[in-house]
């Protein structure tokens, strides 16, 4: 995995964490982690459509302050993850199942190896939909 940036927003400092580009098929998905030494477990925070990791700094800080590890990703076509549209300001995927496939790859080949258990899902909007889809899959790692 290659290092990836975490940017400071006008009103929100980036909580101390780490970010990487995770390769999935022909794309690179930005993933980030905070407080991986936690003994309480990991909250997998998943954003809604058109959102990005930096938008959730306040929520991430709240979870870290309560002793949890946090893991998050920018969906394909969002934030600093790869885009398939020629116009790099447009978030687009070929089909919705691409998001499911990406999440399955990241969960099973990165998050579950790097993050402390137990695992808790927390999703907003599209992120909640994709977490639910993952919950009912046969590869579900959540407690």
PLM ranges: what are they?
Residues 114-125:
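Alpha/beta-hydrolase fold nucleophile elbow
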Residues 128-139:
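Short glycine-enriched nucleophile-adjacent loop
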Residues 27, 52:
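Donor nucleotide-sugar binding loop of glycosyltransferases
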Residues 40, 46-51:
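Active-site glycine-rich loops that stabilize anionic/oxyanionic intermediates
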Residues 91-111:
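Alpha/beta-hydrolase active-site loop
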Residues 40-41, 67-68, 117-118:
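Short coil/turn segments at beta-strand junctions that form active-site/ligand-binding loops
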Residues 1-23, 29-36, 121:
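An N-terminal hydrophobic leader/cap segment in hydrolases
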Residues 53, 60-86:
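Conserved alpha/beta-hydrolase
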């Amino acid at each position: 995995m290659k290092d990836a940036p975490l940017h400071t927003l006008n009103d929100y400092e980036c909580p101390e964490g780490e970010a990487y580009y995770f390769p999935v098929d022909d794309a690179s998905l930005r993933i980030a982690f905070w407080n991986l030494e936690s003994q309480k477990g990991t909250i997998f925070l998943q954003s809604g459509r058109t959102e990005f990791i930096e938008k959730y700094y306040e929520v991430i800080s709240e979870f870290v302050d309560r002793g949890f590890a946090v893991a998050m990703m920018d969906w394909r076509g969002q934030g600093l993850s790869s885009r398939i549209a020629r116009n790099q300001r447009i978030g687009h995927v070929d089909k919705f199942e691409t998001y499911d496939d990406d999440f399955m790859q990241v969960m099973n080949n990165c998050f579950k190896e790097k993050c402390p258990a137990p695992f808790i899902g927390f999703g907003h909007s599209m992120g909640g939909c994709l977490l639910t889809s993952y919950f009912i899959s046969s590869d579900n790692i959540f407690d």
